[in-house]
Amino acid sequence: MEVLNAIGRRKTSVARVYLQSGKGSIVVNGLDFKTYFKTEPLQISVESPLNLVAEAGKYDINVNVQGGGVTGQAEAIRLGIARALVLVNSEFKSPLRKEGLMTRDSRMVERKKYGKRKARKRFQFSKR
């Protein structure tokens, strides 16, 4: 099987996922994903597309991810892996879509407005 690639995005994170048949290693920016993502919820999030379609341990996945924080990066990788699995077998699309793993989360950080402390929070108001 040749190398398949897919892109996942979340907030400002962009993950380029390269999937090929192998023993099941997931490498993120040159590190094992369990070293890169230290908390268990993030590790489970990254592995969830593979576990859902029972393909864990069948593919070697190499990921280049940049931008954002760890949660955004983990969710970008999750989307990229799900998209790559659909390229392998189109039958995976419906269970992945049903679990919401094929949908790009389009929520972005709202910009800060002038005259306010943050995007919506106002400066302290003094009545007297």
From Swiss-Prot:
Highest taxon of source: Bacteria
GO terms of molecular function: RNA binding; structural constituent of ribosome
InterPro entries, alphabetized: Ribosomal_Su5_D2-typ_SF, Ribosomal_uS9, Ribosomal_uS9_bac/plastid, Ribosomal_uS9_CS, Ribsml_uS5_D2-typ_fold_subgr
Key words of the record: Ribonucleoprotein, Ribosomal protein
GO cellular component annotations of the record: cytosolic small ribosomal subunit
Gene Ontology biological process terms in this record: translation
NCBIfam families, per database record: PRK00132.1
Protein's recorded name: Small ribosomal subunit protein uS9
Gene that this sequence comes from: rpsI
